[in-house]
Amino acid sequence: MFLKVSVVILCILLATLIGLNLCGFSYWQLATQTLRNRLQATHVAVQPQRVNFEELDGLPAPVQRYFRKSLQNGQPMVVSVKMRHRGTFNLSQTVEKWHPFTSEQRVVTQRPGFAWNADIRLLLGVPIMVHDAYIAGEGILHAALFGLFSLVNIRGTGKIAEGQLMRFLAESAWYPTALLPSQGIHWQAVSDRSAQGTMTDGTICLTMLFTFNDQDLIERVEVESRGRTVDGKIIPTPWYGYFWNYTERSGMQVPLNGEVAWLLPDGAKPYWRGRIIEIIYEFTP
């Protein structure tokens, strides 16, 4: 009798999990498509349409070397990007709770914006779905169990927007034409292996430190203060992104692996480690 009851309970739990997964997947996919439509609607024409190394004159030496290494003179400019990632995500800011994730990301370079859709798997395959986005000056962070039950839902034009624009700038190593001066990035020398990049979008102006490796490619991007979500509040915290495993994609040198971390008083706390498994570019005609 006990065995029969246990089997029935197990079947009910399984059916519930399957139902939540199916319902949540449908709901989340609709929300994801809405985000992507909003992102695409912000797109404006990229000018100029070709990379011209003449605009590198006067830039800090490591920045010039980076562009000459990662781009080709005369190549078209990146308009948009579709990419897929796979990796692990640490769901705790105090202990190590790494879980596997897969994600898809859309990027438009002008007006700068992105929409990241992630699926983080817990035990028994229970999903946490995440939207991380910057669209038309608005920052968005929404995480939901099964895609249905919100765990975090923050959006706005304040610190959350600034933090998401920082992500766009840091990840420009994946779409390097967006870092050119003609695309609105101002560069200032720091050392022979580093420089500050400043960008402005709407009312947001931010500066990040770029460090270049021995191959003249972006190795690390960091900032002294980026908004970290703690108990539903935004806390300014030092942050970095680290990139490696550069490979040629569509004529550009881009990193396939990355790690991002908060720099807490007791040391670095990585929370995202991933690899690009597919990247598709749309270029200017």
Describe every region a protein language model picked out.
Residues 197-281:
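Gly/Pro-enriched, hydrophobic low-complexity segments
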Residues 21-31:
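Aromatic-capped interface at the extracytoplasmic side
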Residues 6-23:
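Hydrophobic membrane-insertion alpha-helices, especially the h-region
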Residues 64-150:
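N-terminal mature ectodomain segment of secretory-pathway/periplasmic proteins
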Residues 142-201, 234:
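Flexible, processing/modification-adjacent segments and terminal tails
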Residues 78-84, 110-117, 140, 190-198, ...:
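Short, hydrophobic/aromatic-rich segments at coil-to-beta transitions
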Residues 67, 100-105, 133-137, 141-142, ...:
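Buried hydrophobic residues that stabilize the cores of well-folded domains
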Residues 31-82:
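N-terminal leader/targeting segments and the immediate start of mature chains
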